[in-house]
Amino acid sequence: MKKIFAMIMTICLMASALCVTTFAEESTDDFVITVSAEKEDGTVVKLEDYTSFEAGWNFAMEKAKDNNYLDNNDYVRIVVDLLTDWEADADGVFGDSDGEGFECSTICIPEKARVMLNMHDYTIDRGLEYHEWDGEVICIYENADVIINKGTIKGGKSFNGAGGIHIKDKANVILIDVHIDGNSVRGDDGAAIAVYDGANLIMNGGSISNNFMRASTTFFDIEVSPYGALYANESTVTLNNVTLSDNYTFDSAAEGVAIYATKSTVAINECIVSGNAVAQEGRYNAKSVIAGYDSKFIITDTDFTNNASDGGDNCYGDSRLFYFEDSRLTMEGGKITQNNPQELLYFEDSDADINKVTITDNASVVIYVDNDSDSEKVNMNECTLNKNASIDNAPDIQVETKGTLAMNNCAIGDTNFEDKGKVEGVGSLFGEGSLTNILVIISLIASGVAIFLVVYYNKKKAAPVAANGATDTEADDEE
């Protein structure tokens, strides 16, 4: 009997151990979020694992917005690690608005929260089929301090303020290798990202791609046009090694299909801008790919290829690669090639310094300057222009007011001017193609000098000729 009882107990203990082990393994596998805290010395303290996105995110945001909790524990910020893809439910809902981490079904980062979200190459997808109010994927509130690492944000469709990430007043946001893909807005701004009122965005690596925008119609049948895959208003944006590609519109009145900035500073460094605002089936051209109003742009070593459309189906009105009004552009290096808007660079009451930029093989007017006076000036220095021809054979260089465009040491080939007299530095040795011209002229002078010296040297070597036509030797023989 004792043996039987012992056997039963052994079996029960083994079964219990197996159940505990199995439960533990299943629980670990079911974790979707880990919440930790980063200390001032860089170490990370694990706080909790969660099997529910909603519960884990709410807990993280409660801690992240509590600056007393963070400071008293010497924590710099709360760290959230995604352990799998995060998808909204069938209605596009991420979580209940009763929690700290959600509002109007959107993932929220509260005011003054300090957060790092490590996505580990996973995707956050709202999966909306139609546009709705607050249809963005993530909303970052005022004065928040946020870092997001390595993942994809997609599936947002909003009527108000951003499809992907909505960044509110004075928030500081750093995105590292983050891809904002396949989001949209209707009648509002920032299909991918919208940055507002004193906020600061730094984006290192990653992409803004395949986001779209379309107009909406008000109750009074007034059409409201959308602006920008990336939209900045009174803010600062820095893009380093970012790809902006294949962003598009269903409405030809859209502006800044890739980037639209008003009263902002935008720095674009070593980026690729390609395939934006290209008209094709179901897609239209737009007023501009990059648009700046009362803004400052600093663009360095960035390539612009295959953007915009002019002529053909789904092309209506003017289209530009760059449109600047009351703005300032500094552009250093890079290429502008194989684009097809009506104009590449359009300046209205704006200043620019464009240095060492190659502009070739575009089916467009190269530059159009519409400044009111010569106090606003566009300077092109050591640039290369060649093989640019607009569809309607309009002049490549068009200037409304004399003296508002200067071309210095530029290599210009196969380029025509509406009026060379309005462009400083063109039509003289130090103007059109001056580097090439100077080299050619120097070469010609050098060749002439060389020929003269050779002739002179040969004459010196030749024997002197006597008055009767014989050489001195012949004259001596005759004597």
Protein language model features and the residues they cover:
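N-terminal extracellular ligand-recognition/capping segment immediately after the signal peptide
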Residues: D74-R114, D121-L128
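Right-handed parallel beta-helix
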Residues: N118-Y122, D145-G155, N172-S184, N200-R214, ...
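Extracellular beta-strand/beta-solenoid scaffold signature
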Residues: D91-C108, L128-C139, K157-K168, S184-Y196, ...
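Acidic Gly/Asp/Thr-rich repetitive segments characteristic of extracellular carbohydrate-active
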Residues: F31-D81, D85, A90-S97
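Cytoplasmic C-terminal tails of single-pass
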Residues: K461-E479
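Hydrophobic core
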Residues: M9, L13-L18
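Selective detector of the "anchor" transmembrane alpha-helix that sits immediately C-terminal
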Residues: T436-V455
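Sec-dependent signal peptide cleavage junction
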Residues: A17-D30, G433, N458
